[in-house]
Structures are given as structure tokens and as C-alpha cells.
Amino acid sequence: MGNIHIQTKSKEYDVYVGKESLSHLTTIVQNMKPSVSNIMIISDEAVASLHLQMVVDALQIEKKVFSFVVPSGEKEKSFENFYAAHTSALENKLDRNSLIIALGGGMIGDLAGFVAASFMRGIRFVQVPTTLLAHDSAVGGKVAINHPLGKNMIGAFHQPEAVVYHTPFLQSLPEKEWRSGYAEVIKHALIGDVKLYHWLKEEVQTLADLRDEKLIHILTKAIPVKANIVAQDETEKGVRAHLNFGHTLGHALEKELGYGNITHGDGVAVGMLFAIFLSEQVYKVNLAYEEMKQWFLKYGYPKMPSDLNVERLVGLMKQDKKANAGAIHMVLMQEYGVVNVVSIPDETVHIALEAFQKDMV
């Protein structure tokens, strides 16, 4: 098992990664000061049916524990569920000394974290991620819900008390969720750990390799990339935006295709390829785009859909949180491990997207 220490300006906490990580949950709760009054577990239907009782059993404490369960899927990260969670919290008499446990993937972590950030102006919460994708979202304190006009547009920065990454929970994931989460692993390697990138190319030939000791190795290498960036820039005023590599187009694809019709990781994978494609043009460098494209396709990542309207995508990219004064800002790569946020004219993005779309046919 590997423990990773996270340090930000507002809080320090640990990420527990391994096959026995759930055993730490009781101690984490018992050591909180002031003592926890009661506990609300927020989860989704798919995860709750598999893991909720195990988490309740792991909480060997004499506190009231209750659950709030929403349907599964990114579209459930909504204001309606956010409001309903607050209603449940009030009905079950949560107070300022209560604790929320986010049990699930990134959607649940974002929803539960935002409930914790806003209930009585902020109470404590613990992340218990159940997906590979959540190795990214569970760390760093960004919590949010979606708006019909954009993803993660309503939210806050609210750090957890701890992250408990019990890797056996991941074994129930379907292949598409392994692939989705692996895209964020690749992202962390490309922007902040070139040694990990080369290790992935050698050691992860198929998604089935993302198991056991290799999985723990990946998590204990990828999470510190994010931790180091968050330590420098907790509230995304500068370098934290580098973590959005691939996300400008990725989020646009999610919005255009409809949440649930493309996974977050698949969208980010296409977005990273486009960012590399455009970076070669902007920086006049060779980033081995063709080789990277074949590597991504080997894992089953999708191609850029040929029937999407490029002009609409450009419009959606201008709604990205990095956009400034109506201009598209993208994270581009100078070389592996070195990225920058760059303002790109609409016409340049449009021309590049059309060329990228044709190349991916």
C-alpha cells in the first residue's frame, strides 16, 4: 500500500492507496477534531448495490450513518440532486460537525463534495473513489455540478479530509470505465512525469494490465503529479490549468454528444490528441503525433467523430472555463512534460479541427 501526502494552502491530508485501504476509514473518522456527530454517505445506484454495505460495515463507530443514493450517470450531477441531497441532510439532522462520505466515481465525488462545501457553509467530507478516473477528481478539492450550458460550471474549492482508494472496488468496473480512467493517467504522465509515460508504453499493452501491483504503481505515480500542481496553485489561478490538457475539446465533445454518450476519458483522449496535433503546428515541433494516435487507438479510444459540426465545437470550446474575453485558451505541449496555456484564435482552431477531423477518419 502507498500513502500520498497532499499539501495545499488550505489543508493537508493523505491519500491511502491499496488493497486494504478501507481499513483506515474508522481511524480517519475517529481522529477528526471536533468529533464527528453523524455521517451521510452519498453514492449512486450502481456503486451502492456493490459497495455501500461494505463501507457501512467498515465504519466501526457508534454514530448514525445514513445514505443518499442517486441514479448513475454524469447527467445526475445536477442541481436537482444537489438540492435533494441538502433536503436529506436536513431531514437527517446533519450539523456542522457531521461528515459526508463520497462513495463512487468522479460524478459522485463532485456532487457530494459540493454538497459538503455548501451545507451550512461547509462541512467535512472524505472521498472513497471507486473508479480509475476518480484518481484525478478525488484529489485537489474541485467540486461541482453541471449546468445545461456547461460542465462543472457551478462549484467550489473544498478539500477532503482524506481520500481512501480501496483498489478492490475497481475490479467491478466495465472496460469502458478502465479506458476512461486510463486517459487521465496518460494525461498526468504527459504533462508531469515523462518517466511514467515511457513506463506505460512498455508495461501497459492492454487495459487488462491495469490490475494489482501495476495498478497501485500507476496510482502512486499519477496522483503525485496532480498533488504537486495543486500544491502550487490550489484555486486554478495559474499552473493548475495545466491539468486541463485535452479537456477543452474533451468537454466540448461531451456537451455536443450528450453526457453519457461519450465517457469523460474518451473525450479527453480525443482532446489530448488534438492538443498534440495543434501543438506541433503552433510550436513547430515534432511530438510524434502519428505514433501517439496509434498508441491511443490500441487501447480503443475513439476517433474524432466525422459528422460533428466544427463551428459548433469551436463555440462550445469558447465556453470553457479557461476562456478569457471570448478567446479560446488551450493547454498546448512544447515537449513531453512541458505544457502552457495558450490563447488560440478561433480561425486557427477551426482550421486545425477540420484537418484533425479528416486525419482521424
From Swiss-Prot:
InterPro entries in alphabetical order: Dehydroquinate_synthase, DHQ_synth_AroB, DHQ_synth_fam, DHQS/DOIS_N, DHQS_C
Name where it's found. Cytoplasm
GO MF assignments: 3-dehydroquinate synthase activity; metal ion binding; nucleotide binding
Q: What is its EC number?
A: 4.2.3.4
Give me the reactions it catalyses.
7-phospho-2-dehydro-3-deoxy-D-arabino-heptonate = 3-dehydroquinate + phosphate
Q: Name one GO cellular component term.
A: cytoplasm
Q: In which pathway does it act?
A: Metabolic intermediate biosynthesis; chorismate biosynthesis; chorismate from D-erythrose 4-phosphate and phosphoenolpyruvate: step 2/7
Annotated residues that bind Zn(2+) are located at E184, H247, H264
Annotated GO biological process: amino acid biosynthetic process; aromatic amino acid family biosynthetic process; chorismate biosynthetic process
User: Which residues participate in NAD(+) binding?
Assistant: S72, G73, E74, K75, E76, K77, T130, T131, K142, K151
UniProt keywords, alphabetically: Amino-acid biosynthesis, Aromatic amino acid biosynthesis, Cobalt, Cytoplasm, Lyase, Metal-binding, NAD, Nucleotide-binding, Zinc
Q: What class of enzyme is it?
A: lyase
- Cofactor, how bound (note): Binds 1 divalent metal cation per subunit. Can use either Co(2+) or Zn(2+).
Where does the sequence pass through the membrane?
none
Task: Tell me its cofactors.
Answer: Co(2+); Zn(2+); NAD(+)
Job description of the protein: Catalyzes the conversion of 3-deoxy-D-arabino-heptulosonate 7-phosphate (DAHP) to dehydroquinate (DHQ).
Question: Which protein family is named in the record?
Answer: Belongs to the sugar phosphate cyclases superfamily. Dehydroquinate synthase family.
NCBIfam families documented for this protein? aroB
Q: What is this protein called?
A: 3-dehydroquinate synthase
According to its UniProt entry, this protein's organism is Bacillus cereus (strain ATCC 10987 / NRS 248)
* Upper taxonomic lineage: Bacteria, Bacillati, Bacillota, Bacilli, Bacillales
Gene that this sequence comes from: aroB
